[in-house]
Amino acid sequence: MADPMKIRSQQMDTAIRMLTDGTFSKMTNRKVPAFSLEQAAALVGNAMHETGSPNLSKTDVVEIDSGAGRGMMQYTGERRAAYDRANPGNDIRRQLEYAAKEYTGKYDPGGRSLVGYTRSLETIPRRDVVAATNHLLKNYFRPADPNASRQERINNAKQVLKIYQQLTKPKSKVAQDKPKPNALTSILKIFGVAK
């Protein structure tokens, strides 16, 4: 597997932050709780596959093969028509805002959600990135053949999780406890007086 840090981008940072800091939750009127890092990595890993963009730099993509899906979540059918009317563009914030509002029913004429009835974003496994990825694949993204892309989505999610775990990992206790040399100590080391 390639160095995960090479796929990190501003768009990915924004998506992870919005999902984990409660911003996305607020957009759903708290219907969906703030995501754990594993849940956020699972959603981003799935979106990477859906968009074909390994760093989420292109989120407003139109599916080439069947021409049906569009956007970060590759909305199809009625969900695609609502997406086209909302026109969130390529901005990751607007893409996630659209997803939140669509989930809570804003774009459904009957006031019901086009996907929220599944409760798929409310029931994602919290601490297992593979289980979370599979849950979202089956219940939220729902491709025609989930097995065709399952492993790629899982690998994407694991890469994303690794990136953000590395960024949030606390420094080792040894590194924290090691005293930092002051200017006098540094000068004494030069003359061989201090170690």
Labelled PLM ranges:
Residues 37-54, 99, 135-137:
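Short, functionally critical alpha-helical segments immediately adjacent to catalytic or ligand/cofactor-binding
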Residues 112-122, 145, 153, 158-160:
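N-terminal secretion targeting segments of exported proteins
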Residues 1-41, 147-195:
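Extracellular cell-wall/glycan-interacting regions and their flexible linkers
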Residues 98, 107-110, 135-146:
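Surface-exposed interaction patches
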